[in-house]
Amino acid sequence: MGKPNIYLFPQLSDNYGYFIKNPHATEGVLIDPSDYDMCLKILELNDSKASHILITHHHEDHIAAVDKIRNKFNSTVIGYSQDDQIPKPDLPVDEGQIFEIHGQKYEVIHTPGHTLQHINYFIKDHNILFSGDTLFNTGCGRMFEGDPKMFWKSLSKIKSLPLDTKIYCGHEYTLSNIKFALSIDPDNQDLVKLADWVNQQEDEHRPTIPTTLKEQIHCNPFLRCDSEYFFRYYDSKEPDQIFAKMRSAKDNF
């Protein structure tokens, strides 16, 4: 199956939703629909219906429109089998499970940390990741339910994906993330270059998504907790402890 089209659209204040469909198709997949009207607009623009809905986690700003869309389009809802706080999935899925929608194969990656039941979806044949609130451009989600060891393990799973993986996350937080990253890694020239681009995108009211895993490994401090630089910076060689200190610093930045 050829590469699907991915349509990013804004929801609420700073959320992103995604509509995935194959070229010339009239149905596709919505990810984390929270703004019903915006979801209808993106579907209408593409003369399509939502055959499926994928849920990454149970926070209201990622699921608020799920039931209304399911009722309107008879959509198949897919979500983590262990998350009893999401709308009841028609297809419950688990870590490592692979399922197919419209010829595209999706792999489920369990990424606890932001919530205990958070999952990512990876389109295997095209190296496309929908990371929800686990990984952002130059940042990561707040640690509401997990612990540092758990969250670092989740990020390490993402780090093991192919370097050309395109990452589509749940929020436009990049500008604030960049400011924090520069405060602890000011001499990182890859980060400085990315910051220039992010500022330009912000000035032009353009999204900073998607990013790539290669770019994030160079620029995202939360993926670099196992680097020599942060070993020295935090005087530790334990990545999960470094992550804990870094996440706390970002929370208070």
Regions picked out by a protein language model, each given a short descriptive name:
Residues 31, 77-79, 130-131, 169:
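Hydrophobic residues in well-ordered beta-strands that form the structural core
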Residues 19, 98-124, 128-129, 160:
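Core dinuclear metal-dependent hydrolase active-site scaffold
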Residues 139-165:
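Active-site-adjacent loop/tail segments of enzyme domains
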Residues 1-46, 120-132:
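Conserved beta-strand hairpin/beta-sheet module of binuclear metal-dependent hydrolase folds
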Residues 20, 32, 57, 69, ...:
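Divalent metal-coordination and catalytic microenvironments
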Residues 28, 35-108, 193-197, 201:
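Active-site HxH/HxHxD metal-binding segment of metal-dependent hydrolases
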Residues 156-166, 175-253:
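Accessory terminal helices/loops
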Residues 33-35, 58, 82-83, 114-115, ...:
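Active-site metal-binding loops of divalent metal-dependent hydrolases
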